[in-house]
Amino acid sequence: TLENKSIKEICYLGHKNALKTYLTLDDNINLMQLGNCEMLKSYLDKLELNKYRDVTVSNLSFGQQKKLALLRVFLNNSDLIILDEPFVGLDDSAHTVLTSFLNNELDKNKSLVFTSHISCNINSKILEIPK
């Protein structure tokens, strides 16, 4: 049950990215006070965001903003991740990376709940609701 877990262990990302558009990509990551996270460089590389670290979020494309928001979710290291349409706005490469991230989180025995109109290859139980 979740009754004994603190709210810090649950991470939700809705259809709005919850980014501070007047700050840079790095500033948005630093707001989370994660310290020196080993995974950060790897995630930035995989999501092709390294070259945008000093760019103001308002100058990033929708897809880049989405990747940044998802990056913050994974750096948060929560036991339960809830995502609303995480694949919207992502190109094929980012879709593949996100699928890999999600499967990696499931391999770490985390729980994942998400909605999607876009097909994905997640290694877990999937409930499809017919139209």
How should these model regions be labeled?
Residues 81-85, 90:
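Catalytic Walker B motif of ABC-type/P-loop ATPase nucleotide-binding domains
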Residues 37-52:
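Conserved ABC ATPase "signature" region
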Residues 8-17:
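ABC nucleotide-binding domain signature
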